[in-house]
Amino acid sequence: MVGGTVVGDLQVLYQPDRPELGYLPEGPIGCGSGEISWVAIQHGPEQDVGSLNVLDPAAGFNRHVELPGRPGFAFPTDDPDVFLVGVERNVCRVHLGSGECEPVSDEVDGGVENTIINDGVEIDEGLVFGCKDLAFDDFKAGLYFWRAADRRVFQLRDDQLCSNGKVVRRDGTGWWIWDIDSPTKVVVRYRLDPASGTLSDPDTALDLTHLPFFPDGMVEGRTPSTVI
């Protein structure tokens, strides 16, 4: 069933005082302590590096960690000093204190060029994340499941252009995943089996092709039947 859309108001939560941090911000993710993690994908049009950031909105204080590449997402872990970050083509453990960036996955999108990790979402068993074609030209970027227990990466799709927004909900032993490939203007739904690392065929959950703009992100709404 194709849903409808509702328009709401927005307000600025935080404006970085460094222009490089405001060039391509992505996220944010709540850390459970009142803080928010977010990434600056790259620090300018000619840059190929970005940063992990942890914001305390109440204090207006932002911690900043330079990364050796361009990040697509950052999620907190049980260790408050460690975040799981998608950097270029690897899932990495990044330490806030030292800035160490340790790959914990094989490289993704190995069969194609000019793609990087762009967006992800946490599930109990690990991460589901997608990539984007930097030229926004070829539908060649992958969608992946990284399983934390054995650090194994499963390729779920290899035909996306810019994977850019995900919502997940538990369904028995698996997960329903809602995903946007931005240029298609369509939200699709799959069922992920984390034990086998397989994805069902997609069905259309929300058709936005009638709108003049492209969807650039998606998060869970306040009720089970809505997304933002």
Where are these predicted regions, by residue range?
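Recurrent small/Gly-Pro-centered beta-turn motifs in extracellular repeat architectures
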Residues: 40-41, 86-88, 131-132, 179-181
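A short helix->beta-strand "capping" segment at the edge of beta-propeller domains
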Residues: 2-22, 55-60, 66, 105, ...
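A short loop-to-beta-strand structural motif that recurs across blades of beta-propeller domains
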Residues: 49-53, 90-92, 141-144, 186-188
